[in-house]
Amino acid sequence: MSDKKLDQIRNRIDEIDRQLHELLNDRARQAQAVAEIKKAADPAAVFYRPSREARVLRGVIERNPGPLANETVARLFREIMSACLALESPVRVAYLGPEGTFTQDAVAKHFGGFVESVPLGAIDEVFREVEAAGTHYGVVPVENSLEGMVTHTLDMFTRSSLWICGEVVLPVHQCLMAAGGDPANVRRVYSHGQSLAQCREWLDSHLPQAQRIAVSSNAEAARQASGEKDAAAIAGSAAAEVYGLALLASNIEDDPSNTTRFLVIGREAVPASSSDKTSLLVANPNRPGALHALLEPFARHGVNLTRIESRPSRRSAWDYNFFLDVEGHAEEAPLRDVLEEVRSRAGFFRVLGSYPCPVY
């Protein structure tokens, strides 16, 4: 390719960049105008709208002709919306910390990089922070594809009035990191017990002599390894940035399908977005056939029940609550009609939230 042709292409790229710059700032000004109108009508107005953002991202993907991948385009627009929302009204999000955990990655994936994220030490602390309006939202883990449900998160919904406002599905990719750059010098490997188990085959093959030490979190493992020349940590790549570690190996998990699901919790219900799911908490009367009676309306109306989990209710021995995930929004047919039937048959019934299905 001639130098003249290259110059033409580069000049075109420069022109596109100038147009993008102008359009991004124009979008930001429109977001500020929206904020002014909302604040004038209601000083306590809510600016982050999960259903609105989900519709925007779905539209971006539907219109995408390539060559950029759908997920790449969605991530770009997520950051644009996050930056504009920060101009309207900064959003504070509590999450299960410490800094550098996969939960922090889930915050970034759902809200973008322009929110104020607040790490807390326990799941119940995240719930309390949102309930007390210390933050607008919280993000907590609820299920891992290998380890199962995070029961503490489920149990918190039995005593909290918060709503589920969103869901984040995050592939879990483990990395080996250390203060030094030579894996041959590693004598100890720190990580959470689950992560050590999930990387056992890789460790057996590559670091068979290294001592494996379980700690409270992967972020704590990275912090510990940052102060020891002959130690390494297994954690997500974000932890390496936080604690100044070098990545020695990436994607060392034994099962590449390892995925964690997170819930976004908040104080207000979310309107329909056209592609939603609903989470429920129900308890059935203690009589034969009661559970079948609760589930029968879903099948009769053709509503897909995607998940059912039982947890001890703590009301009495062998008494259980059931957590259900179903397709649809609680305020729209046919699910709305199904829930009225279930409510009339249940010993206890609560909609935990209807929220957009993850876009990417």
How would you label these PLM feature ranges?
Residues 1-360:
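Domain-level signature for soluble enzymes in the chorismate/prephenate branch of the shikimate pathway
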